[in-house]
Structure formats: C-alpha cells, structure tokens
Regions:
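Extended beta-strand/loop cores of jelly-roll/beta-sandwich
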Residues: 1-197
Length: 197
C-alpha cells in the first residue's frame, strides 16, 4: 500500500496486535489471547454523510423505477442495462408515472393524507458476487462456479426509527422525522444503516 489519497480515502497500514484476554475479568468469548495480523486497507477519510448516502438511495430508487418502466438498453451478449438517458426523464410528480410505478409506492392504507410516496421498504439494492474464499478451499476444488455465487436484496433506506429505539430516554422525534431527508443535516453522518448497506 501507499499513503496516497484515493477519492477521499486514506491508506490504513497493516499491523499485528494481541487480541483477546488473559485475566479472570474477561468473558469466555475473549479467550484465548492470541496474535492477529491485519493487512493494510483503504478506508474513507470521514464518515459517510447523509448527502452521500442519499445519492445512493435515490440512485437505487431511480434504478428500480427505470426497471419498472422498461427503460433498458441491450448490453453485451444477453445483458441489459438501464438506459439512464430515459431514466433521467422520470417525472416523480406526474400522476400517470406514479400509477405505472404503483408497485413501488406505499399502499393506500399506509399513506398520510393520501399522499402517493415511494415505499422505503421497496428501495432495495440487488447484490451479487462470487465467494472467492469459499471457492478457494481445497475441499471445494472441482465444484461448479454457480455453487459460489451469492445473490440477495438489501434494503437501503436508513432505519430512521433508530433515534427513538436506541435513545428512548431522549426526545428524538424531530430527528426521526427529518434527520435523513432534511438538507440541514446533509453533511452530518448517516445514521440507521448497517455494514451491508
């Protein structure tokens, strides 16, 4: 690794440390104390902000809408890709468009004052990859590639109720309602996401 900066990322040098415990006050899962070596890695210099994460959420939302509306173009072989020229024309305030996207919207019984809005639980990112670590195991030699491909959908909208659930002793209702969406909090760190998101 090097110390050069990559798009607001910094290089964290690897090293070795002692992990675990060797005294009576430790929990059972802290034994035995052992040496651990961590390779160097790149890491964001700062936490992800609401503005940065919001871009990803809205990109996912627009991707799902483009799929629903059939805004595709043919890629290599049999692959298809979203036609972003067409996707940029999606009018989120147009009643006819919203009707075509009804599968992504809150059901009528979940709307406040009947307002048609996207259902945060339907903003999901499709994750696909190849488990190299599992495929490289000696006992898996010769197994077909498809055995090591993983696919799953991950909800990406932050859990805004975390403000009330995790800090129930405080008055955090305003944060629950506006923290992620309001521009005043755009440069604040995103809250309510997990490592998969």
């Amino acid at each position: 690794g090097s110390n050069e900066n990559h798009d607001s990322m910094v290089w964290i040098e690897g090293g070795t440390f002692m992990m675990g415990a060797d005294n009576e006050q430790a929990s059972k899962d802290e034994y035995p104390k052992h040496k651990v070596t961590v390779n160097g890695f790149w890491m964001d210099a700062t936490e992800i902000t609401n503005n940065q994460y919001r871009q990803f959420v809205w990109w996912t939302k627009d991707s799902l809408a483009a799929v629903q509306l059939g805004f595709f173009k043919q890629g290599q072989e049999s692959d298809t890709a979203i036609d972003w020229v067409k996707a940029r024309t999606i009018k989120w305030n147009d009643k006819a468009t919203l009707e075509k996207l009804s599968a992504l919207m809150l059901t009528p019984d979940n709307r406040i004052y009947g307002k048609i809005e996207i259902d945060p639980d339907k903003i999901v990112y499709n994750i696909q990859g190849f488990d190299l670590k599992e495929a490289a195991k000696y006992e898996n030699e010769g197994r077909p590639r498809k055995d090591f491909i993983y696919r799953y959908n991950q909800k990406v909208y932050p859990d805004t109720l975390v403000w009330m659930r995790d800090f129930s002793y405080s008055y955090n209702e305003p944060m629950t309602k506006r923290y992620f969406a309001h521009p005043s909090f755009g440069t604040y760190p995103v809250v309510g996401v997990n490592w998969k998101q």
